Amino acid sequence: MIITSLLDTDLYKFTMMQVVLHHFPAANVEYRFRCRTPGVDLVPYIDEIRDEVRGLCSLRFVDVELDYLRRMRFIKSDFVDFLALFHLNEKYISITPSPKGNGEIDIVIEGPWLHTILFEIPVLAIVNEVYFRNTQREPDYREGRERLREKIKLLGAKPEFADCKIADYGTRRRFSKVWHEEVALTLRDGLGPQFAGTSNVLYAMKHDITPLGTMAHEYLQACQALGPRLRDSQIYGFEMWAKEYRGDLGIALSDVYGMDAFLNDFDMYFCKLFDGARHDSGDPFEWGERMLRHYEANRCDPRTKVLVFSDALDIPKVMQLYERFRGRCKLAFGVGTNLTNDLGYVPLQIVIKMVRCNGQPVAKLSDSPGKSMCDDKAYLAYLRQVFGIAQPVEEDASK
């Protein structure tokens, strides 16, 4: 079985799930799967994927896992008590061949948000591992280890990068769970203090690594349906987050509606309240410069704030960003696929995104064309109008 623990997921799933329990326990949602890599035939592996998901739904949290979560300063005891009773229910997920007949598969997760939020990460990890264990029956781990050593060597070679730290954000697109664990341990041992931690809660617990994560796009997307007014949904999301965490876990995700809309909403109050912001699409250099100017304009010293970069990073790009912004702010870098699925094979670009909440469409308007995902063109156009965002040519609804 690929997933053997419900902790084998990203920390931000638990931090968001706690908000859902306390503030949105009645919300119902729908998620859909998409493979952005052209020409990939996943249909032959449907039965294997279903079997693995069935195994996932048989799992429960065990006492040692619950105790670990309970020790986190921002996790409340009633949430851990809820998790002690929790399991994923197979009735909320369906996996079928796409009617398009082109090798794509449809994975639909639909049900109470509180009971479906933990599906996404392990299901993506399952799809990845099932695909690669069938297409690469004798993995070239030697090549993977050599590439990983070169990355560690590159980051650790220059004294001026001694304070440049990276984190593992690679659970969802990892080659396999065995390889992921080896990567995390190799980074811990090879980078020392330059390894900031991992988003994977299981490996954090097992190997005494710092777990990292705050919020994901789905949280702010859901607020489109849960908040009082669509135009204020991003503000509402940040306010509810602050209501739950009271200043803790203060990294705001910036690209659900694009950078312009984020800066309009992220006023002096949020600039001072939140520790920083996370970049996940668009030009990271331009984004960083705009964030620093925004902090200064809102009477915040940028040197006290954290800029988190997590969009398709590799080590050279991390180093370029560090060179640009070091000394001007605090920096954090989350590296995903380039760490956990770099053995010489083409990684799958797969996602599971929320598309509805309480029966209403929800969407992400990314700073990167092609990253937006919404199955309702009329709603997408309306959302752009509300937030004053031009429609890019790549997403012309007439196509």
From Swiss-Prot:
InterPro entries (UniProt xref): N/Namide_PRibTrfase, NAPRTase_N, Nic_PRibTrfase, Nic_PRibTrfase-Fam, Nicotinate_pribotase-like_C
UniProt GO cellular component terms: cytosol
Disulfide bond as UniProt keyword: no
Keyword ATP-binding set for record: no
In-chain residues carrying the UniProt-annotated modification Phosphohistidine: H217
Top enzyme class: ligase
Pathway assigned to this chain's UniProt record: Cofactor biosynthesis; NAD(+) biosynthesis; nicotinate D-ribonucleotide from nicotinate: step 1/1
Keywords: Ligase, Phosphoprotein, Pyridine nucleotide biosynthesis
Catalytic activity from the UniProt record: nicotinate + 5-phospho-alpha-D-ribose 1-diphosphate + ATP + H2O = nicotinate beta-D-ribonucleotide + ADP + phosphate + diphosphate
Post-translational modification remark: Transiently phosphorylated on a His residue during the reaction cycle. Phosphorylation strongly increases the affinity for substrates and increases the rate of nicotinate D-ribonucleotide production. Dephosphorylation regenerates the low-affinity form of the enzyme, leading to product release.
A GO term, aspect molecular function: nicotinate phosphoribosyltransferase activity
Residues making up the signal peptide according to the UniProt record: none
One GO-annotated biological process of the protein: NAD biosynthetic process via the salvage pathway
Enzyme Commission number, as recorded: 6.3.4.21
UniProt similarity note: Belongs to the NAPRTase family.
Role this protein plays: Catalyzes the synthesis of beta-nicotinate D-ribonucleotide from nicotinate and 5-phospho-D-ribose 1-phosphate at the expense of ATP.
Protein name: Nicotinate phosphoribosyltransferase
Organism listed in the record: Burkholderia orbicola (strain MC0-3)
Gene that produces this protein: pncB
